Amino acid sequence: MASQLQNRLRSALALVTGAGSGIGRAVSVRLAGEGATVAACDLDRAAAQETVRLLGGPGSKEGPPRGNHAAFQADVSEARAARCLLEQVQACFSRPPSVVVSCAGITQDEFLLHMSEDDWDKVIAVNLKGTFLVTQAAAQALVSNGCRGSIINISSIVGKVGNVGQTNYAASKAGVIGLTQTAARELGRHGIRCNSVLPGFIATPMTQKVPQKVVDKITEMIPMGHLGDPEDVADVVAFLASEDSGYITGTSVEVTGGLFM
């Protein structure tokens, strides 16, 4: 079984945004571990390069045998940057990515009564607009090349149930769910599957800013009794990226340990 997983994505080229840390890095490691070539993208180029180093490159003794991963830098909230990212990936690997995972995301928390328009706009721009731009550019590349693919967008359970102090984040992640379902309806005839993943409270750099007393309270609400790890999300992404999920599209998979059932 282990050897099968190591080769499950052996022919895949995977573009992962937000690959410099947290869920994005864990997804990159998991996909590479299953044989995929990874194009790791982050706003922080050095962080993306560090992820690629962890994957192992040509001639490296670490990582999967195929190796040839590459790092890219892009601000996915800008249309031109998103288009250029896909062009750069295609130029580097001579084909469009068959797996696209949008993990890039930010928070700017504040209560609704005090939230600034700027904080609203920043979160919507990265989390929702950025996911739209990458999804659109990837779909255009796949369709124009006559290729099948799997697009996986990282949403959040907060997009389904809301959360105090996160009106902008909740709205952005709810939008990702709707975007992904609509994309699935439109792109299915092209052989492109689109699914979203809804993490719960996952131990990442983003959640490390949460006060410990809040973490303890949330942990008490999780039936599984503990926070999730980025690898828990990566496990689901790898399944959705593979042909093991070949008849699954338009779905939203919750990775929450049972939080907010």
Curated annotation (Swiss-Prot):
**Where NAD(+) is bound, by residue?**
15-23, 42-43, 74-76, 169-173, 202-204
Active site, UniProt feature: Y169
Keyword Cytoplasm annotated = no
Bilayer-crossing regions: none
Kindly list the GO molecular function terms attached to this UniProt entry. (3R)-hydroxyacyl-CoA dehydrogenase (NAD+) activity; estradiol 17-beta-dehydrogenase [NAD(P)+] activity; NADH binding; quinone binding; testosterone dehydrogenase (NAD+) activity
Q: Name the residues that bind substrate.
A: S156
The observed outcome of changing R148E is: No effect on the ability to restore growth of an OAR1-deficient yeast mutant
**Which reaction does this enzyme catalyse, per its entry?**
a (3R)-3-hydroxyacyl-CoA + NAD(+) = a 3-oxoacyl-CoA + NADH + H(+); 17beta-estradiol + NAD(+) = estrone + NADH + H(+); testosterone + NAD(+) = androst-4-ene-3,17-dione + NADH + H(+); 17beta-hydroxy-5alpha-androstan-3-one + NAD(+) = 5alpha-androstan-3,17-dione + NADH + H(+)
Q: Which PROSITE patterns match?
A: ADH_SHORT
Against CDD domains, the record matches this protein to:
BKR_SDR_c
Give the main localization category: mitochondrion
Q: What is the effect of changing V158L?
A: In a breast cancer sample; somatic mutation
What is this protein identified as? (3R)-3-hydroxyacyl-CoA dehydrogenase
Native organism: Homo sapiens (Human)
